[in-house]
Design a protein with these regions (language model features):
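Acidic Gly/Asp/Thr-rich repetitive segments characteristic of extracellular carbohydrate-active
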Residues: 1-31, 44-46
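Surface-exposed acidic, glycine-flexible loop patches that form ligand/cofactor-binding
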Residues: 17-25, 52-55, 129, 183
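Residue-level recognition of the N-termini of beta-strands and the immediately preceding loop/turn
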Residues: 26-30, 60-62, 133-136, 160-162, ...
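Right-handed parallel beta-helix/beta-spiral solenoid domain characteristic of secreted/periplasmic
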Residues: 38-119, 145-159, 231-240
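Extracellular beta-strand/beta-solenoid scaffold signature
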Residues: 44-47, 78-93, 114-129, 151-187, ...
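Hydrophobic or amphipathic alpha-helical targeting/insertion segments
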Residues: 100-101, 127-137
Length: 262
């Protein structure tokens, strides 16, 4: 196990040390204090780095959860970007990391005007064309954004605010689609279960690479809702701004062997 501290003064401080990890010998769990609230830094909390991503595996997993009791809330900062910006605003993002579980957190965007509103609650991005995000689980989270953000997107970034947004791009060039260099560069085998998502333009979006046959460079095996009603997601009050731009509870594009069920 990496030499992390037993306790940290903030989630941000814990992530700084976590992203500096170079080796792991077993699973790591970060348990956030019940009732705690922390504001995200500009562009959001980030999980993923070149060293951490190389250390994570099916046995060296990362779980971020909360202690029993009152909700643990991550709040949005003040955004500056629109959905068609290269570097969108969000609360929490996974960047190329694998085997990460986000369990039971509450994410809230209290901004009420654009462009201060967030483009995503939880974003899942690639670190590079060779390092996609794989085998991650987002479950039991409550995500509330602002559906007034219905502005036009660009490239793989869709219109407006998205509760959970998985994108074929890196977070600092989010509107530029990547061509995966191999299967490791896809966003594959990720699961989204038992989340409550509200007041967004889209609830969940998974947007992959338009692969050609035999589709080895396409996203594969992503799962929205699991196999029973207990693991379904609740998505309400989506679509907004009163504009003609599209909105949906779930939007899926360029995916293979995906599951969508509630």
């Amino acid at each position: 196990t990496p030499a992390l501290q037993a306790t940290y003064p903030s989630f941000s401080a814990a992530l700084t040390d976590l992203n500096a990890v170079t080796a792991m010998t077993g699973p790591v769990t970060l348990t956030l204090a019940a009732g705690a609230t922390e504001e995200a830094p500009a562009k959001g909390f980030t999980i993923g780095s070149a060293t951490l991503n190389a250390a994570l595996s099916s046995t060296n997993t990362l779980t971020i959860t909360k202690a029993a009791g009152a909700a643990t809330t991550l709040t949005a900062g003040i955004g500056t970007a629109a959905p068609n910006a290269a570097s969108p605003d969000g609360i929490l993002k996974i960047v190329g990391a694998d085997y990460v579980t986000i369990d039971g957190l509450t994410l809230v965007d209290g901004n009420t005007t654009n462009p201060e509103t967030m483009e995503f609650g939880i974003g899942i991005f690639k670190a590079s064309d060779a390092d996609g995000a794989q085998h991650n689980m987002i479950r039991n989270c409550t995500i509330t954004l602002n559906r007034i953000n219905n502005a036009s997107g660009s490239g793989p970034m869709v219109e407006g605010s998205v509760g959970i947004n998985m994108v074929n791009s890196i977070p600092t060039a989010a509107t530029t689609s990547l061509t995966p260099s191999g299967a490791s560069g896809t966003n594959s085998n990720n699961s989204f279960h038992s989340n409550v998502i509200e007041n967004c333009n889209y609830g969940i979006v998974i947007n992959g690479y338009a692969a050609s046959s035999p589709f080895t460079l396409g996203d594969t095996g992503n799962d929205i809702g699991g196999g029973s009603p207990a693991t379904g997601n609740t998505i309400t009050n989506f679509g907004g701004g009163g504009t003609s731009n599209p909105a949906a509870g779930i939007r899926v594009n360029n995916q293979w062997s995906a599951n969508i069920s509630n």
